[in-house]
């Protein structure tokens, strides 16, 4: 069946002028305005009701969060606009398999809450590189990991989210891509710079609700339009564009016909676009890196009131992660059915006409569905949903990136920095991050056949596995030491960067114009590459650790799984260095007790807005400090809640197995 008969509006979005008029109505605009007012109100409320004047308050929300905002924030930080654009786009191009990536996380959030976070809390750390410094000693691993994490944020998270959010705004409002980016970032940076982690978590919770309500409504509209689930399965396989040749060039059938295995998540190990061994093992390695060792995710868990709230948040997030298959991937596939000529275009000149890039237009599958299918008012709601997902991800990343920079890099360079100076440095760093990310957007636009999600996963496959190997061994094998971990990371990085640079130099190509990259380098699927890279890093770490001196247990109490319950006092490997750093801070605290000059009204307003006001709280006694430290590193739970949460964890893993089996 010729799918162009599906909707009289099939080509309505080709000219920005028409789309600009689509969203120029009172209902849409008022919903968007209400959305921004509510978000700013929640951000301001969090800003003035929480303590942001200390590093712990700004970066860890004062360890006071309960389970439901943590679960919502974990989900919202993970689901950016890159997911709406990327998952729906890859779904439109190749079927449901990409949704299985999301289900992989159901098992890993349980691993995070039950195995990894207890160790991080007992270690008493704020950042992941800080944990590695306590575990291995020395500074080189900490600085290396901080820099690599910041690079990963720029290459995968920030630039991909900015790009996908801008695609959506460009399609809905007709705004220039870069103007759209500028507006988004201005608002996002404003409440991250001023509000700290509490503002981020509360706005994330609000945005999760908006995101789920909006996308469920759109999913209902989409399935109604296409005639239900059975009709959707049948029509997707027939969604083939009519223009498949350009002059004398006729494109191969595989470039524009839906895959025969579109409705299976486990695909052929050799010819599949997402081969099943890579899907199970390679994806699990990437998911382990992201969910169990990434600053953005772990920071939310560390802000929890106690261990039960951590586990509750992880379980809530796990159930929410069931949704993207149905609210993002399948609507993307329906978009291909309804607007086949545009979404499934294969001729470069046609694609450029529809979406401004020659490699394919699947990235606009979800935005097109919103702009074309939703009635007035609801269209504004969906634009708010996209903005919500974009801004919640960006605020999370900005807050975590500034934490990494401030605590792991800046504090090393400026050992005598006061608390106030650290706060200002963290906020200024966010502005630098934004500039670099915008510069990377054009590269994201053309990578991986124009499929955003494949681009994100491939970069992660080249840089993430060595980090996963180090954390896994650091926590579960006490024999691993600093030289082993460091050289494992360095070798893994060199191999990963070689593949990444080669792929960018040759271009990833597309079905119509394959890349000239040598098969020995680019021919290995990125998920298989992740397995190989993980294995090389793992073996390197183990071998070098066995050939070098072990770390005495006295330095490892409560830093690895086998010693997690030890009561002895730990002598930190970095204790001497910490004493040097802490010395000047005491003198600074003494200095601040000197009577200050009264500040002017503008200066007081500025300090209040940025959370830099100094509260004259009395200094804690040594006993109080000890009690506070005990509370901050306590992982005990009430027996009833531990049982309830364990049962829920088992149910969640069972649901994950069922979903994989049902759609296999």
UniProtKB/Swiss-Prot annotation:
UniProt keyword list: Cell membrane, Disease variant, Disulfide bond, Glycoprotein, Ion transport, Membrane, Phosphoprotein, Sodium, Sodium transport, Sugar transport, Symport, Transmembrane, Transmembrane helix, Transport
Outcome (variant: residue 83 to Q): Loss of D-glucose transporter activity
Name of the protein described by the UniProt record: Sodium/glucose cotransporter 1
Free-text domain note: The cholesterol-binding site is formed by transmembrane helices TM1, TM7 and TM13.
Gene: SLC5A1
Disease link: Congenital glucose/galactose malabsorption: Intestinal monosaccharide transporter deficiency. It is an autosomal recessive disorder manifesting itself within the first weeks of life. It is characterized by severe diarrhea and dehydration which are usually fatal unless glucose and galactose are eliminated from the diet.
Mutation effect (residue 204 to A): Loss of activity
Catalytic activity field: D-glucose(out) + 2 Na(+)(out) = D-glucose(in) + 2 Na(+)(in); D-galactose(out) + 2 Na(+)(out) = D-galactose(in) + 2 Na(+)(in)
Result of changing residue 83 to L: Acquires D-mannose, D-fructose and L-sorbose transporter activity
TM annotation in the entry: 25-47, 67-90, 96-117, 140-169, 177-193, 203-221, 276-295, 310-331, 376-406, 423-444, 452-477, 482-504, 526-547, 645-662
Organism (species): Homo sapiens
Residues bound to D-glucose: 457
Site (Involved in sugar-binding/transport and inhibitor binding): 460
GO cellular component: apical plasma membrane; brush border membrane; early endosome; extracellular exosome; Golgi apparatus; intracellular vesicle; nuclear membrane; perinuclear region of cytoplasm
PANTHER family assigned to the protein according to its UniProt record, in alphabetical order: SODIUM_GLUCOSE COTRANSPORTER 1, SOLUTE CARRIER FAMILY 5
Upper taxonomic lineage: Eukaryota, Metazoa, Chordata, Craniata, Vertebrata
Glycosylation sites: 248
Outcome of substituting residue 363 to A: Loss of water permeation
Primary localization: membrane
């Amino acid at each position: 069946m010729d799918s162009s008969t599906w909707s009289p509006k099939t080509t309505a979005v080709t000219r920005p002028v028409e789309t600009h008029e689509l969203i120029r109505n009172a209902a849409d605009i008022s919903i968007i305005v209400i959305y921004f007012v509510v978000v700013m109100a929640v951000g301001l409320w969090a800003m003035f009701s929480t303590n942001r004047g200390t590093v712990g308050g700004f970066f860890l929300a004062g360890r006071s969060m309960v389970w439901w905002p943590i679960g919502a924030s974990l989900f919202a930080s993970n689901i950016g606009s890159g997911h709406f654009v990327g998952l729906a786009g890859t779904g439109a191009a190749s079927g449901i398999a990409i949704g299985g990536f999301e289900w992989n996380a159901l098992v890993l959030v349980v691993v995070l809450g039950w195995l990894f976070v207890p160790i991080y809390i007992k270690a008493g750390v704020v950042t992941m590189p800080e944990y590695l410094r306590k575990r291995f000693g020395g500074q080189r691993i900490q600085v290396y990991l901080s820099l690599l994490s910041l690079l990963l944020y720029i290459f995968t998270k920030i630039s991909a989210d900015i790009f996908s959010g801008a695609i959506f705004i460009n399609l809905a409002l007709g705004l220039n891509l870069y103007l759209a980016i500028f507006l988004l970032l201005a608002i996002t940076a404003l409440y991250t710079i001023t509000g700290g982690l509490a503002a981020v978590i509360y706005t994330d919770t609000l945005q999760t609700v908006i995101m789920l309500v909006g996308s469920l409504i759109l999913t209902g509209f989409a399935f109604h339009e296409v005639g239900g689930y059975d009709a959707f399965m049948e029509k997707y396989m027939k969604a083939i564009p009519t223009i498949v040749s350009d002059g004398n060039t006729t494109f191969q059938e595989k470039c524009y016909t839906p895959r025969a295995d579109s409705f299976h998540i486990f695909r052929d190990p050799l010819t599949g676009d997402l081969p099943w061994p890579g899907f199970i093992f390679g994806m699990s390695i990437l998911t382990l890196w992201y969910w169990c060792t990434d600053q953005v995710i772990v920071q939310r868990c560390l802000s929890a009131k106690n261990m039960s709230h951590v586990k509750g948040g992880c379980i809530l997030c796990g159930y929410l992660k069931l949704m993207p298959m149905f609210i993002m991937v399948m609507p993307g596939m329906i978009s291909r059915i309804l607007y086949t000529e545009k979404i499934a275009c294969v001729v470069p000149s046609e694609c450029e006409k529809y979406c401004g890039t020659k490699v394919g237009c699947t990235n606009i599958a979800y935005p097109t569905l919103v702009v074309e299918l939703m009635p007035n008012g609801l269209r504004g709601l969906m634009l708010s949903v996209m903005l919500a997902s974009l801004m919640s991800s960006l605020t999370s990343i900005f807050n975590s990136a500034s934490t990494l920079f401030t605590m792991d890099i800046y504090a090393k360079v400026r050992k005598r920095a006061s608390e106030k100076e650290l706060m200002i440095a963290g906020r200024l760093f966010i502005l630098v991050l934004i500039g670099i990310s915008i510069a990377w957007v054009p590269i994201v636009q053309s990578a991986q056949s124009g499929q955003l999600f494949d681009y994100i996963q491939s970069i992660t496959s080249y840089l993430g596995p060595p980090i996963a190997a180090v954390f896994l061994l650091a926590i579960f094998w006490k024999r691993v030491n600093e030289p082993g971990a460091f050289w494992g990371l360095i070798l893994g990085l060199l191999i990963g960067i070689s593949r990444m640079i080669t792929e960018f130099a040759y271009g990833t190509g597309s079905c119509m114009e394959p890349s000239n990259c040598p098969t020995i380098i680019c021919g290995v699927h990125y998920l298989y590459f992740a397995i190989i890279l993980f294995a090389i890093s793992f073996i390197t770490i183990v071998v070098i650790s066995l050939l070098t001196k072990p770390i005495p247990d006295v330095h490892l109490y409560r830093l690895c799984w086998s010693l997690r319950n030890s009561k002895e006092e730990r002598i930190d490997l970095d204790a001497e260095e910490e004493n040097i750093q802490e010395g000047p801070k005491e003198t600074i605290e003494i200095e601040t007790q000197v009577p200050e000059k009264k500040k002017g009204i503008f200066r007081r307003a500025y300090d209040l807005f940025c959370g830099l006001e100094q509260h004259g709280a009395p200094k804690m006694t040594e006993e109080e400090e000890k009690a506070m430290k005990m509370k901050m590193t306590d992982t005990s739970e009430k027996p009833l809640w531990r049982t309830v949460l364990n049962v829920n964890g088992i149910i969640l893993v069972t649901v994950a197995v069922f979903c994989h089996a049902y759609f296999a």
